[in-house]
């Protein structure tokens, strides 16, 4: 399922050859993202991103679910891809996911947008460690 989801997004992005259409598609993903404004707290703030960004996680059973918010629709759209891939997975599965797995998805984005995804993925891994689970 994880691989299929990555491949699905990779295929869609590979078919978009115009940067403005890519941003339009990413913005459409941002509109689909369910945001919880209550996560906009100092402990959920993600340092290092170009715009204000927040992420939190909850555990339901043995599955992890992330909540995300940002002042940028492009960031929201890119993170929507990440959340579609990681939400509902086990800690063990999420720990295996690296930025390299997203290389084809972010290849058409400017370096700063690529860095933002890397920073958010790093923060997600950090949040998992804070759960105290040693899987």
Give names to the regions the model predicted.
Residues 58-72, 83-87:
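Conserved interaction-surface patches within small, structured recognition/assembly domains
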Residues 79:
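Primarily the active-site beta-strand->alpha-helix module of PP2C/PPM metal-dependent phosphatases
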Residues 86-90, 117:
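Ampiphathic alpha-helical segments that act as solvent-exposed interaction surfaces
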Residues 91-97:
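Short conserved catalytic/interaction loops centered on acidic-Pro-aromatic/His motifs
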Residues 2-52, 58-60, 64, 97-100, ...:
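N-terminal intrinsically disordered, cationic/polar leader segments
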């Amino acid at each position: 399922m994880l691989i299929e989801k990555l491949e699905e997004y990779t295929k869609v992005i590979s078919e978009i050859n115009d940067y403005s259409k890519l941003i339009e598609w990413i913005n459409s993903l941002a509109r689909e993202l369910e945001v919880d404004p209550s996560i906009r707290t100092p402990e959920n703030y993600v340092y290092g991103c170009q715009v204000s960004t927040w992420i939190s996680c909850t555990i339901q059973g043995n599955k992890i679910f992330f909540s995300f918010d940002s002042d940028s629709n492009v960031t929201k759209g890119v993170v929507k891809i990440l959340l579609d891939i990681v939400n509902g997975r086990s800690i063990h599965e999420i720990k295996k996911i690296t930025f390299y797995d997203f290389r084809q998805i972010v290849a058409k984005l400017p370096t700063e947008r690529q860095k933002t995804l890397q920073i958010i993925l790093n923060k997600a891994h950090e949040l998992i460690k804070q759960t105290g689970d040693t899987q």
